[in-house]
């Protein structure tokens, strides 16, 4: 019981740190994306992320990589969901207020919990179910569907939430011995490669001062 609580606390700590990183990243992406364009911004960020993750990956010296390629299909599917989530979210972020986008993102833990209950057969419980319902109503009060603040870009933000939800469900189904850095590296590489091909094909590149 103590071990499980300790694991939950560790997971919550890393989740909090990652969320702080996400918010910082979102602020910079909104600032830069409006100047350079979506694809170029994702590509440049992807190059730096891929290099950084690759250095960490080499430093950690993962040896159990042969078995990773046995799960290539699910890893690729997860990476594509990450790509869709990134595109949907950043389009919404660039064209909406920061507050409204993040208000929609507040539904993410609620949607993931419901999806885990349906797809992974995880137990929610009455108290948690009531909290989820209240949470959804709270988010609806913030985003106010039907008003001018809720537009087509809001729908893209919702698609981003759904993409992240299915991405996390796939992640949950992956073997626990699959190196997280390998998964992150493949995901970053696929996202960067896809946007890079798009930039080359359409020859879209804004000068960087």
Roles of regions detected by a PLM:
Residues 1-20, 50-77, 126, 178, ...:
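Membrane-interface interhelical linkers
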Residues 89-91, 108-130:
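C-terminal transmembrane-helix exit sites in multi-pass transporters
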Residues 27-30, 38, 53, 149-206:
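Transmembrane alpha-helical segments that form core, pore/gating elements
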Residues 61-99:
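Specific transmembrane alpha-helical segments of multi-pass solute transporters/efflux pumps
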Residues 34-40, 88-105, 176-181:
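Structural motif at transmembrane-helix junctions in multi-pass transporters
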Residues 19-24, 54, 79-87, 109-114, ...:
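Hydrophobic/small/kink-forming positions within alpha-helical transmembrane segments
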Residues 7-11, 43, 67-71, 139, ...:
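Juxtamembrane helix-entry segments on the extracytoplasmic side of multipass membrane proteins
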Residues 127-144:
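Hydrophobic transmembrane alpha-helices of multi-pass small-molecule transport proteins
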């Amino acid at each position: 019981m103590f071990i499980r609580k300790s694991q939950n606390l560790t997971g919550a700590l890393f989740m909090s740190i990652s969320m702080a990183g996400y918010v910082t990243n979102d602020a910079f992406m909104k600032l830069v994306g409006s100047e350079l364009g979506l694809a170029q911004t994702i590509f440049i960020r992807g190059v730096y992320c891929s290099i950084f993750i690759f250095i960490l990956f080499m430093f950690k010296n993962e040896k159990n990589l042969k078995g990773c390629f046995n799960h290539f299909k699910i890893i690729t599917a997860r990476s594509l969901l990450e790509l869709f989530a990134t595109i949907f979210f950043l389009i919404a972020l660039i064209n909406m207020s920061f507050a409204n986008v993040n208000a929609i993102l507040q539904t993410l833990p609620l949607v993931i919990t419901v999806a885990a209950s349906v797809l992974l057969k995880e137990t929610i419980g009455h108290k948690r179910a009531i909290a989820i319902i209240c949470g959804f109503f709270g988010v609806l009060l913030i985003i106010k569907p039907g008003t001018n603040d809720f537009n087509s870009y809001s729908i893209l933000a919702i698609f981003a939430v759904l993409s992240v939800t299915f991405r996390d469900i796939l992640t949950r189904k992956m073997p626990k011995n699959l190196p997280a850095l390998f998964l992150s590296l493949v995901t970053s590489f696929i996202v960067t490669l896809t946007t890079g091909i798009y930039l080359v094909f359409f020859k879209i590149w804004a000068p960087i001062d």
